[in-house]
């Protein structure tokens, strides 16, 4: 069937996101995986940035991933806390939304999700990259969307969402 999830982003709440957002989010590490959920208070409260934070959260599109929390954080089967595992047996169903800050239509599609990457799969890295797979078993089979505007294709079998760990805060950079 057609994907039906709908995500709402409240920028004031994102800005003040704590270490323990509640619900099914983990309250500490799972399987040794470092979990880093809060916004960095040193940036959020910095006089140079604090008045820009909410508008900055709306400057670029947002990708929203909705799935059963166990698909990510379950100690035995969660892909995020078992990130070094590879292959189709480590793919989980999810709903993926593209939310454009200007209100123009994005996309909303059911897909498979895996962890991607090499060294960044290690549990010392708190942010992992995702790969989304668009297949008939999840719904439409392909993503048909002008993701890059007039440049390139509008049809996708998969998309990678990279984290760029080199020279990042997570890698001492």
What are these regions (language model features)?
Residues 2-173:
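Phosphate-handling architecture centered on phosphoinositide signaling
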């Amino acid at each position: 069937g057609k994907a039906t999830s709908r995500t709402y982003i409240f920028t004031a709440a994102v800005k003040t996101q704590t270490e323990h957002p509640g619900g099914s989010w983990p309250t500490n590490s799972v399987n040794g995986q470092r979990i880093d959920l809060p916004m960095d208070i040193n940036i959020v409260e910095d006089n140079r940035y604090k008045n820009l934070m909410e508008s900055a959260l709306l400057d670029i599109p947002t990708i929203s991933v909705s799935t059963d929390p166990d698909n990510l954080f379950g100690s035995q089967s969660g892909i995020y806390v078992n990130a070094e595992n590879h292959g189709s047996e480590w793919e989980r169903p999810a709903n993926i939304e593209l939310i454009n800050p200007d209100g123009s239509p994005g996309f909303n599609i059911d897909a498979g999700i895996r962890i991607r990457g090499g060294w960044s799969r290690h549990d010392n890295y708190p942010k992992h990259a995702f790969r989304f797979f668009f297949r008939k078993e999840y719904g439409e089979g392909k993503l048909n969307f002008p993701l890059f505007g007039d440049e390139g294709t509008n049809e996708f079998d998969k998309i990678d969402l990279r984290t760029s760990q080199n020279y990042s805060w997570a890698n001492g950079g």
